[in-house]
Amino acid sequence: MAGAYDDRDGVIWMDGELVNWRDAKVHILTHGLHYGSSVFEGERAYNGKIFKSREHSERLLKSGEYMDIPIPYSVDEIEAAKEEVLTASGLQDAYVRAVCWRGSGDDMGVASERNPVRMAVAAWEWGAYYGDAKFKGAKLDIAKWKRPSPETIPCFAKAAGLYMICTMSKHAAEAKGCSDAMMLDYRGYVAEATGANLFFVKDGEVHTPTPD
């Protein structure tokens, strides 16, 4: 076991520089902690190369635009940060998490324009998401909560606040002995699992729900 995520060896890229893992901290009055003003990407590196890395960085910036979180880094700068973390960590096969959020500042109400936008990149070893179930077959619950209509949320943003119903749904699924929960959209169609996409093969073609 690697231990708790706040008590590990290594480094994390934070606001433009590498810091010791245990020193990568934020203030308790960070806006993103209270109001969900945060966007992120979850990526996988194989043999030292991040799968579709640039596309992830582009989506991170786009998520920031959707959420009115102007990320102060370019795609190239985000790419460089991820490579720096992987190299410094000595990892070849890893999970890479890039996250941006509204930090602590002059605002502590709902509005946060005067608060700085901060960013961090961390990487660590993380095995198969479903463990042995990846090979034996994962048992899925049907989530109580549905993915909201795009008229009610910025559904194209990978935003932290949009994952709360996913957390609740996975807790309920695990309590029933399931690996995860399948979530339906607001129309009752299959959308995704709580932290993974769903695919199936029919007549030699791969199908997955449309991103709406």
Regions found by a protein language model. Name each.
Residues 78-107, 124:
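Short, acidic/charged, Gly/Pro-enriched secondary-structure junctions
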Residues 1-84, 110-212:
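Helix-start/capping segments and mature chain N-termini
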